[in-house]
Amino acid sequence: LKKQVIYLMPGMAASPKIFEYLEFPDTITVKHLSWIPPKPDESISSYAQRMSQRVVETNVVLLGVSFGGVLVQEMAQFINCKKIILVSSVKSPDELSLPMKLAQKTQAHKLLPTQWIKNLETLALFVFGSRIQKRVALYQKYLSERDPVYLNWAIDRIVHWGGCAVQVP
């Protein structure tokens, strides 16, 4: 009997390590996707097409968390996909939060100091002291994608996401 392949896509800035404690039955083969650097001014559709090249099987299940959920919907346009599972994500731009919709109109997201995330540990330890050390270790482990170029790209793409042809029930 052929095993079902499921690809897991973490959310923005997150590492595939967020899935480390998930357990699946022996009938499922789990594969993890990681964020790749975006090309300058790359559309989310073009990015999804590049990410889709990492999916080698057909009839797969794609699971995406948050912004990863948006990405797997876009990827499903380029691969043979049996099912899409969204976790803490949106199915259409209509479901974006009010702050995201406001950012769309005001471009306020471009003012976010994403370069601070590179040194999040130093900032947190300075502000909160050693009592936050355990939490900082978790941030280092699970939020490993901190390149400001990637973060600015990802935030802009979610704010301006126009939806895609794939319909998620």
Named regions from a protein language model:
Residues 2-58, 106-117:
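Active-site catalytic motif of lipid deacylating hydrolases and related acyltransferases
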Residues 8-9, 63, 87:
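Short hydrophobic segments within beta-strands
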